[in-house]
């Protein structure tokens, strides 16, 4: 029987999909808090940098996958880009829709979608973005294959995800902080230690930068690049469909 990782546990694919769904239903209303806890607030700067690298244009249609709360999409929309926000979790989408209304942000389409089996036709998007979402997908390679399928020829793929830093001193410090402090923050502020513990564990089980780059290549992308941040604690991956 196939097993996939859920944090440090190995579970069936169906169980992981269900468990991850539960995690994000619980954290949806406090998603910014979760990201602040895991990044020390730096995720806001990283996302700004990420969108600058995408170089969105007003004439483009971009798919922001696992983007339910709108963090990336709102930044893309500032360029006049048409953005489709897709997320498997309806609770995350509801948070994003409310935030968009409050900010009077337009040019957005909201879709409940599974990254491994998108409902879109082939060759329809100019760019595909996914930030801090792909490590929660049950079958990462399937999601990458789908990203390639729905992109136009000449389309760009951008993924930002936590990884493992190569700065040894910082690595030890962050591991201590993430393992012992972040779950307690989750318990204190959200009464949800388990969800925050899973999110930290999922980082350690995610492929390293080199292996994930190989997976992007296997999906069919070329000109693959990885831009490490803080020694690789976070990396921005990119590739092109030709």
Curated annotation (Swiss-Prot):
It comes from the Bacteria. This is Ubiquinone/menaquinone biosynthesis C-methyltransferase UbiE. The keyword S-adenosyl-L-methionine applies. Methyltransferase required for the conversion of demethylmenaquinol (DMKH2) to menaquinol (MKH2) and the conversion of 2-polyprenyl-6-methoxy-1,4-benzoquinol (DDMQH2) to 2-polyprenyl-3-methyl-6-methoxy-1,4-benzoquinol (DMQH2). Gene3D superfamilies: Vaccinia Virus protein VP39 (3.40.50.150). Its EC number is 2.1.1.163, 2.1.1.201. Keywords: Menaquinone biosynthesis, Methyltransferase, S-adenosyl-L-methionine, Transferase, Ubiquinone biosynthesis.
């Amino acid at each position: 029987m196939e097993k996939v990782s859920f944090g440090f546990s190995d579970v069936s694919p169906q169980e992981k999909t269900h468990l991850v769904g539960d995690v994000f239903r619980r954290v949806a209303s406090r998603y910014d808090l979760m990201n602040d806890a895991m990044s020390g607030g730096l995720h806001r700067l990283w996302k700004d940098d990420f969108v600058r690298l995408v170089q969105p244009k007003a004439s483009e249609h971009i798919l922001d996958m696992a983007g339910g709360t709108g963090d990336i999409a709102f930044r893309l929309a500032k360029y006049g880009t048409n953005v489709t926000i897709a997320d498997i979790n309806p609770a995350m989408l509801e948070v994003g829709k409310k935030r968009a209304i409050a900010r009077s942000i337009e040019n957005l389409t909201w879709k409940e979608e599974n990254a491994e089996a998108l409902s879109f036709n082939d060759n329809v998007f100019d760019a595909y973005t996914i930030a801090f979402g792909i490590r929660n997908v049950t079958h990462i390679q399937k999601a990458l294959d789908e990203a390639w399928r729905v992109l136009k020829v000449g389309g760009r793929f951008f993924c930002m995800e936590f990884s493992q830093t190569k700065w040894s001193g910082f690595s030890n410090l962050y591991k201590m902080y993430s393992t012992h402090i972040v779950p307690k923050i989750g318990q204190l502020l959200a009464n949800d230690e388990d969800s925050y513990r899973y999110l930290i564990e999922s980082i350690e089980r995610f492929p390293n930068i080199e292996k994930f780059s190989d997976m992007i290549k296997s999906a069919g992308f070329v000109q693959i690049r990885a831009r490490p941040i803080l020694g690789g604690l976070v990396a921005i991956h990119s590739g092109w469909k030709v």
